[in-house]
Curated annotation (Swiss-Prot):
Location in or out of the cell: Cytoplasm
Family: Belongs to the eukaryotic ribosomal protein eS19 family.
The organism's taxonomic lineage, starting at the top: Eukaryota, Fungi, Dikarya, Ascomycota, Saccharomycotina
Species of the source: Saccharomyces cerevisiae (strain ATCC 204508 / S288c) (Baker's yeast)
Keywords, in A-Z order: Cytoplasm, Ribonucleoprotein, Ribosomal protein, Ribosome biogenesis
Protein name as annotated: Small ribosomal subunit protein eS19A
Gene: RPS19A
Length: 144
């Protein structure tokens, strides 16, 4: 379908499709500690999907960067952070792990989806935009 972009597809459908594409492709470099690490200091437990959560985070980050001009690690930490349960005290926002978001960006950069922006942060590359649009078109065709 010509003219289909990531904006035309529901976010969850696209993220699941792109995560499965990245997992099938096997080029994304996954750190060895992903099965035991928490994604934020505010979380009590690591993700339940020990095998595929890194691919879903990578797909989500790629979509997030696609929707904006450029994004840095700090903005991703704030985006993927959440509320920390502090017992009887009120909840408080805690940023996500910067190491995980940095490793995701480095892995996406290594396979050519994102590139370093001269203004700071990362932006989507031409090849990355083409790949994401292609996956979005396939996802839209499957939904119809």
């Amino acid at each position: 379908m010509p003219g289909v972009s990531v904006r035309d597809v529901a976010a969850q459908d696209f993220i699941n499709a792109y995560a499965s594409f990245l997992q099938r492709q096997g080029k994304l470099e996954v750190p060895g500690y992903v099965d035991i690490v928490k994604t934020s200091s505010g979380n009590e437990m690591p993700p339940q999907d020990a095998e595929g959560w890194f691919y879903k985070r990578a797909a989500s980050v790629a979509r997030h960067i696609y929707m904006r001009k450029q994004v840095g690690v700090g903005k991703l930490n704030k985006l993927y952070g959440g509320a920390k349960s502090r017992g009887v005290r009120p909840y408080k926002h805690i940023d996500a792990s910067g190491s995980i978001n940095r490793k995701v960006l480095q892995a996406l950069e290594k396979i050519g989806i994102v590139e370093i922006s001269p203004k700071g942060g990362r932006r989507i590359s031409e090849n990355g935009q083409r790949d994401l649009d292609r996956i979005a078109a396939q996802t839209l065709e499957e939904d119809e």
